[in-house]
Design a protein with these regions (language model features):
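Hydrophobic, small-residue-rich alpha-helical packing segments that form membrane-like cores
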Residues: 150-224, 228-246, 250-278, 283-285, ...
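Active-site His/Glu-centered metal-binding helix of metallohydrolases
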Residues: 65, 69-73, 580
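Non-catalytic terminal extensions that flank enzyme cores
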Residues: 1-50, 266
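Non-catalytic, conformational "gating/processing" segments within enzyme and secreted inhibitor domains
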Residues: 161, 213-245, 703, 724-759, ...
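His/Glu-based metal-binding/catalytic segments typifying zinc-dependent metallopeptidases
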Residues: 43-45, 52-54, 165, 169-173, ...
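Extended, regular secondary-structure scaffolds
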Residues: 214, 226, 235-254, 377, ...
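Generic recognition of flexible, low-complexity loop/linker segments
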Residues: 97, 213-217, 276-279, 322, ...
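M16 family metallopeptidases and their MPP-like homologs
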Residues: 48-58, 84-132, 139-150, 177-202, ...
Length: 973
């Protein structure tokens, strides 16, 4: 299309056209003259289309109003007056992404879809939601999504509840999440960044309906919006839709959403704060020490790229000198770093975990001395080049897993566009990359360290210490505050709250009118592709080993996976497999120090790692096939270097350095402890699944069992180190053996021969010894564990294995997941219960579970699970609703996959003996699912719930109150 700059198209003035060679796209920058909206269209042939509308939202308090408005806009609007159009879209659209996100200074509403009609429908619902939300006239929406007083009768105590209120109680229970917020708030104390945009639970109840509406009125106007379009679409039709349906209804106004720049500090500050741990939890060596710096502005792209490189070189690489200096000084168990350039004034953080407050002076000295030494003597050239290569590989690969590329580009480009900079500058990286490479030659990196780290007074040291009294004090303060509030109320006031609570619950339980539901656009079953995508796979035999070939265009990159059979490893050595996973490739070898090895890996590859993975055979609940997996990604031309490095690691790794092994073990323990509160739901699900099948029991050696193992390993280090030497000497030759080796290669067809010629020498020198398979008697055991942490919310899981109960897997169970997650569990656990989320899974191996996330309840949630069968027996919806559930289910299984994920899916299916015919059968069953099929699953769910297998992680009060449902209760940290 031949468009001209300065011309008007559908009410939009075209200000600039540019080509972005890095992502093979054309960029069109528009301005809507009547409303003042800014629009950027990134045109290319990607069928995974993305739309978003972003508002610059700058909070002025800690009430979380930006976050609560983000939730609430999607709770009904002018054209779509159902209670939750968002949920209806998730149930029944072919979206590849659908969400909304609150950042410290912006709120983003992105959607993505490969279906053109679906894409337009999603845009329509989202635009109506942000500009005409029912939250402005329906106070129950703030009550549900934000907060409300809750009381059932006059004599009951007053309480707070609300989705965001409980979400943030969970978010701020995690020490790393709390640390991140404290760093930001204290580095920019005179700007909008001093406030918690997500909301502080202490302040959330200060938010009134008037403040809520005022925030929306102030910021949710086209003149304060940034509209983004990406992919293969009809530009004129889309612009016309935006103009006629929405933007032309608004007149341009002046909106003050500017972000003040923090005046630099005249001297570095020292800040002390505390975070909660569970009563009775050990607090020794659990302090965080951090040095935090303000770095330029995000508009200075070259500096932003340079600090991405510096973070890797100084703190992330195994060869990072600052990281290693801090570890060797014995200042803590792990070093963490962060460079956040998603705000106007980016921040760079150096963090030691597992420390003590009295080590802060030594911490400061080690950081300063090490950085001075680096400036004086220069950054090691190989380390710097390796770090630049690591960043460049990621930029060129642009593999964002299951997230649409267009979405990640959108988030990245806001780092300039939101602050009135060039809208596309973060998509053009070639020139900046050249500049950064030149800086490496000129000593500019050392100058950046001097200017922004050593001489920078706009910085602070933040000490975050554990305190077991925090939760008790917070709970007492809250109880006292609510008791005083209730005491100050008249009987009429209390009765009004009871009535308001009842009115809210009635609204939450009410069913949307059929005519309102029908206003939300819905595709037809005919719009869905009937055939599932075929697995891309072919078998070869190379050097007496099986090779799986996945011919996929990878743009010159090879994704390599080598799966070594470890079914020969004895039960008593399984812990050492997971220990080896943590250590191998991170220690010295015969020809490399561990630092030199890290540099070589980063210089020649896009990354490599080892991991234990367990597979099962389709339809066999007692099968388990453990593998020790090597994964790497590399430019095809660099394959020989990758294979040389892999050979060095396999045959010449040394595990004899006590210092290095202890450092790695401490990092491993620290990582696990951080993940417990960050991903509590994953921990309870992993533990629960281990009750049911041998495969999950095997995997559990890498979960909580491994945490216990690594703690003991460190507590009795000298003795355990010697045991490790013996175990590694035994298992290494048994692992790296080509008997039953399976290699998976994902690469373009034309590059396959190059890859094989590079890998063949390794396959030829691998030993070919046959070891007997170990038959390990994994007993099925329901442990029913309760785990206590400092969390103020719970993660509640319950499940069973339905195949063991005599049932079979069917595709209808995938539809049941959609119904449960976005109907029954959504209503009862999120909407009525106040939890942030709930989820459900029915797996082909027979394992099923229900789970809740950041949940204020425990026993009540288990009761909801137990009543599922009753809900299913009475399940009765319209044909239109049933179609919606089927479409939403297909959307979930048809997510676009990157080349790496396509190869991984095909090789995993091969191992499990899952055929295209089986996958097609599942799709056929999904498309044919009826209400009768759903009702027929009630007995299966009932039988699973009667197994009464549960696992919960949560706060001490809730877990102890429910102790009768557990066999064991443990303080986990």
């Amino acid at each position: 299309m031949n468009l001209q700059e300065k011309n008007i198209y559908c009410g939009f003035r075209l200000d600039k056209i540019s080509h972005i060679s890095e992502i093979s796209s054309n960029a069109y920058e528009f301005y809507h003259e009547k409303s003042g909206a800014k629009l950027l269209f990134i045109e290319n042939n990607d069928d995974n289309k993305v739309f978003s509308i972003t508002f610059r939202t700058t909070p002025t308090d800690d009430t979380g109003v930006a976050h609560i408005v983000e939730h609430s806009t999607l709770c009904g609007s002018r054209k779509f007056p159902t209670k939750e159009p968002f949920v209806e879209l998730v149930k029944g659209s072919l979206n590849t992404f659908l969400n909304a996100m609150t950042f410290p200074d912006k709120t983003m509403y992105p959607i993505a879809s490969r279906n053109e009609k679906d894409f337009r429908n999603l845009m329509d619902v989202y635009l109506d939601a942000v500009f005409y939300p029912n939250m402005r006239t329906t106070p129950e929406i703030l009550m549900q999504e934000g907060w409300h007083y809750e009381i059932d009768n006059v004599d009951a105590p007053l309480a707070y509840s609300g989705v965001v209120y409980n979400e943030m109680k969970g978010a701020l229970s995690s020490p790393d999440g709390l640390l991140e917020r404290k760093i930001l708030n204290n580095l920019y104390p005179d700007t909008t960044y001093q406030y918690e945009s997500g909301g502080d639970p202490v302040a959330i109840p200060d938010l009134t309906q008037e403040m809520f509406i005022d925030f929306h009125s102030r910021y949710y106007h086209p003149a304060n919006s940034y509209i983004y379009l990406y992919g293969d679409m009809d530009m004129m039709s889309t612009l016309s839709f935006l103009d006629e349906e929405y933007l032309s209804n608004f007149n341009k106004i002046e909106i003050d959403s500017h972000i003040d720049v923090q005046k630099p500090f005249t001297a570095r500050k020292l800040i002390k704060d505390i975070y909660p741990i569970a009563p009775g939890e050990a607090k020794e060596n659990k302090t965080f020490l951090s040095m935090n710096y303000s770095i330029a502005t995000s508009l200075e792209k070259e500096k932003m790229l340079a600090f991405t490189v510096l973070e890797h070189a100084l703190l992330k690489s195994e060869a990072a000198p600052l990281r290693n200096a801090l570890i060797k000084a014995g200042l803590g168990s792990d070093v963490i770093s962060s460079f956040d350039n998603g705000i106007l004034q980016p921040m760079f953080s150096i963090i030691v975990n597992g420390s003590e407050a009295n080590k802060v002076d030594e911490f400061t000295k080690v950081v300063t001395d090490t950085l001075n030494d680096i400036v004086k003597n220069g950054i090691d050239d190989e380390l710097l080049q390796a770090s630049i290569n690591s960043m460049e590989f990621k930029l060129r690969e642009a593999d964002f897993g299951q997230y649409p590329k267009g979405l990640i580009y959108n988030i990245n480009l806001m780092n300039s566009w939101l602050y009135d900079g060039d809208a596309t500058v973060y998509l053009h990286y070639e020139e900046a990359l050249k500049t950064v490479k030149q800086w490496a030659k000129e000593g500019k990196f050392e100058a950046l360290i001097q200017e922004y780290l050593l001489d920078n007074t706009h910085s602070h040291i933040l000490i975050l210490e554990p305190d077991e009294n925090v939760i008790t004090k917070q709970e007492k303060d809250l109880a006292d505050k609510l008791a005083q509030k209730k005491a100050s109320m008249s009987k009429e006031d209390i009765e009004k709250i009871i009535a308001d609570t009842q009115k809210l619950k009635e609204r939450q339980r009410s069913v949307d009118k059929p005519e309102d539901l029908e206003k939300i656009p819905l595709l037809k079953i005919e719009d869905i592709t009937k055939q599932c995508d075929k697995l891309i796979i072919a078998e070869d035999e190379i050097a007496d080993t099986k090779v799986l070939r996945h011919d996929i265009d990878t743009n010159g990159i090879c994704y390599l996976r080598m799966l070594f059979d470890i079914s020969n490893i004895a039960y008593e050595d399984i812990n050492y497999l997971f220990l080896l996973e943590e250590f191998i490739g991170r220690t010295a070898t015969k020809n490399y120090t561990y630092e030199a090895l890290a540099n070589a890996v980063n210089l020649h590859t896009g990354g490599m790692r080892f991991a234990v993975a367990t597979y099962d055979k389709e339809g066999d609940v007692d099968s388990y096939m453990p593998k020790f997996v090597f994964k790497a990604k590399v430019l095809v031309d660099k394959m020989p270097e990758l294979i040389k490095l892999l050979q060095e690691i396999i045959f010449n790794s040394s595990f004899t350095s006590k210092e290095r092994i202890k450092d790695l073990a401490m990092q491993c323990r620290s990582d696990f402890e951080m993940s417990i509160l960050r991903s509590g739901h994953q921990l309870v699900l992993d533990e629960l699944m281990a009750y049911f099948t041998p495969k999950e029991r095997y995997d559990n050696f890498g979960d909580l069992k491994f945490y216990a193992f690594i703690k003991n390993f460190l507590n009795d280090f000298d003795n355990e180190f010697n045991k490790m030497q013996t175990a590694f000497a035994k298992i290494l030759p048994m692992i790296f053996n080509k008997a039953n080796l399976l290699t998976s290669i994902t690469v373009s067809k034309n590059d396959y021969k190059k890859v094989i010629s590079a890998i063949k020498p390794l396959l030829e020198v691998l030993p070919n010894e046959t070891y007997p398979k170990q038959e390990i008697p994994f007993a099925v055991e329901k442990k029913n564990e309760g785990f206590i942490t400092s969390s103020q919310v719970q993660y509640v899981a319950k499940g069973a294995n339905f195949i063991r109960l005599g049932y079979k897997y069917t595709g209808a169970m995938k539809v049941l997941e959609t119904i449960m997650r976005y109907e029954y569990l959504w209503t009862n656990i999120r909407v009525l219960g106040g939890a942030y989320g709930a989820f459900v899974k029915f797996r082909r191996d027979g394992n099923m579970y229900f789970g809740s996330y950041r949940d204020p309840n425990l026993v009540e949630t288990l009761n909801v699970y137990d009543k599922t069968a009753e809900f299913l027996r009475n399940f009765n919806v319209s044909d239109r609703e049933m179609t919606k559930y089927i479409i939403g289910t297909i959307s979930n299984i048809d997510m676009p996959l990157t080349p790496a994920l396509k190869g991984e899916l095909a090789s995993s299916a091969y191992i499990a003996e899952m055929t295209d015919e089986m996958r097609q059968q599942q799709r056929d069953e999904i498309l044919a699912t009826t209400q009768e099929d759903i009702r027929a699953l009630a007995d299966l769910v009932d039988a699973c719930m009667k197994e009464n297998a549960i696992c919960v992680l949560g706060g001490s009060n809730k877990v102890n109150e429910a102790k009768d449902v557990f066999k064991t209760v443990t303080i986990i940290l």
